[in-house]
Amino acid sequence: MNEFDARLLEGKKRLHFVGIGGSGMFPIVQILHAAGYTITGSDVNEGDIINYERAMGIDVKIPHAAENVEGADLLVYTAAILPGNPEIGRAQELGIPCVERSVMLGYVQRLYAKSICVSGTHGKTTTTGMITQVLEMAGKDPAAVIGGKLPLIHGYGKAGKGENIVVESCEFSNTFLHLSPDTSILLNIDADHLDFFKTMENLKASFRKFAELTQRRIIANGDDANTVETLAGIGREVVTFGQTEGCDYIAKNIRMVRPAFYGYEVWHRGERLAEVTLSVPGKHNVYNSMAAFVASTLAGCTAAEAVRGIDAFTGTGRRFEVLGHTACGATVADDYAHHPTELEATLSAAKQMGFERVIAVVQPFTYSRTKLLLKEFARVLQIADQVVMSEIMGSRETNDAFNIYTADLAALIPGSVWFPGFDGIVDYIEKNAKKGDLVITLGCGDIYKAAKRMIV
């Protein structure tokens, strides 16, 4: 990983963003725009984020074109930008420096006196959103970079005037190694992105490097064996949370307060600090909210302020987000879950909510993940009453090296059906879903588009 360049924006006035309509770009754009830089950008399609950016006075061009970069001092691009992009090519011809989004995120994070960087295979977006909500409701005006839309701030992040920034920190391609957290959070470490990391040891080594970048304090899940092993002998202050004795902060007396929603007490060194009642479903959110409670109180919030923000948190976009109803009255929801651990947590919560049936509409994401975890996918998807699937979304991969298809997964799930496109899925739901059912689309690709077509 390259060393941080503190002079990255020295003498720079106009910053051009390629892929400016992406949710990961938007908070960075907001922060740098508020800092006084002239921002321009481009993307391939119009969208809500671009509408917001234009309302801020930002010049956004559709589509990408070489002339868009003329006069820029620096170009920022997302990892989704394909080789041969005309704007990057023209920038290189003109000698305009080009940096990937994660590099700029590392720079932006350092603009704030204190940073809370949230890492982990699962739960990053929810936990980042919770912490942001607590700090915002406590009047601390944090900056934030979140992977999902947080209703309280009407977006994926914000440029705060306070001393804190809360950053969702992704391990894929080692992008979180550009950060320098004041406080880092390790929620869990699970087998994912092995197309990049190849082995669990490499994955854990990456998280270890991230933890070693921490300047002040590491907040870690003391119940997660991989996390505990990764942090052994780290030489930093480590504060643990969990549900077992031995953790610094312990969730006790966990109970279901209504179907799929949990409450619990927070204890610290024998003292009962608070009682939390979650407004997001699923027992897995006990861990996410414990991390948020610890981070928020150590950032200067009172226990009461932490509880107020956590209790009021109803989720972020694409995290068990209820979208509406079908013509027959079935409830339609959407969730980003795309790993067996996440699917198991989401479907288990859904089954507790009192619906007649849970119909899981799944878009497997990447050939490598599907092949590696095929049996685990088959096991957890059978939690649902009915499984409907699309073809695998390859994203950055081609199937030549993997030879895996949705039909292979469907063969392991009795009664499941699959369709090559969304038309077949939507038609199937229209004909088979009934009032009292929950239809939940699952995946980190574009399966949400099918969900939106189902609702009236």
Name each region found by the language model.
Residues 1-100, 104, 225, 252, ...:
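N-terminal leader/targeting and accessory segments in enzymes
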Residues 3, 8-16, 24, 31, ...:
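Nucleotide phosphate-binding/pyrophosphate-handling subdomain across enzymes
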Residues 6-8, 31-34, 54, 68, ...:
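Phosphate-binding loop of NTP-binding sites
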Residues 37-44, 217-222, 359-363, 384-394:
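Short internal beta-strands
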Residues 42-43, 61-64, 99-106, 145-146, ...:
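Beta-strand->loop->alpha-helix junctions that form or flank phosphate-binding loops
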Residues 69-74, 163, 435-437:
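Short acidic/histidine-rich motifs immediately flanking catalytic phosphotransfer sites
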Residues 260, 378-435:
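C-terminal helical cap/extension that packs against the catalytic core
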Residues 424-455:
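A glycine-rich beta-strand to alpha-helix segment
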